[in-house]
């Protein structure tokens, strides 16, 4: 996913499946508090589908319902190329039957703010 869009045709089915997997997690009320690409394992099956598995599950929270804002905030840690992230957001929004452009924009803003906060924290730590 980090080489997207260079391998677009090959990666789109994987990203479609990943978006669907994350959507199903969220619909079940599961929040993985460190939801990033390195904590999601996947395997292609013989029928061309993908199976996913979460690792580092000690930081999970379970709720009866997740708002769209909680879902977006949870996905902001996905550490992949911005174009791949935007595509995953679009596919997720399609699963959620919500406006894809609005969901993408909100997701991209959440990720940008998250990255800015991370850089500020890193710079402060280096100054101490």
Roles of regions detected by a PLM:
Residues 1-33, 38:
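Conserved kinase catalytic-core helix
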Residues 25-26, 36, 48-51, 74:
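A generic structural signal for well-ordered coil/turn residues at beta-strand boundaries
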Residues 34, 44, 61-63:
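Activation segment
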Residues 39-55:
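Conserved protein kinase catalytic/activation segment
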Residues 50-126:
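C-lobe/activation-segment region of protein kinase-like
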């Amino acid at each position: 996913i980090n080489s997207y869009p260079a391998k677009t045709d090959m990666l789109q089915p994987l990203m479609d499946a990943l978006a669907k997997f994350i959507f199903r997690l969220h619909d079940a009320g599961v929040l993985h508090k460190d939801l990033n690409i390195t904590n999601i394992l996947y395997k292609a099956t013989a029928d061309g589908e993908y199976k996913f598995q979460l690792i580092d599950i000690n930081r999970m929270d379970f709720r009866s319902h997740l708002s769209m804002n909680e879902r977006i905030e949870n996905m902001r840690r996905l550490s992949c190329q911005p174009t791949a992230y935007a595509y995953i957001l679009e596919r997720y929004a399609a699963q959620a039957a919500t406006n894809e452009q609005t969901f993408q924009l909100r997701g991209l803003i959440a990720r940008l703010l998250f990255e800015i906060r991370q850089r500020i924290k890193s710079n402060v730590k280096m100054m101490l």
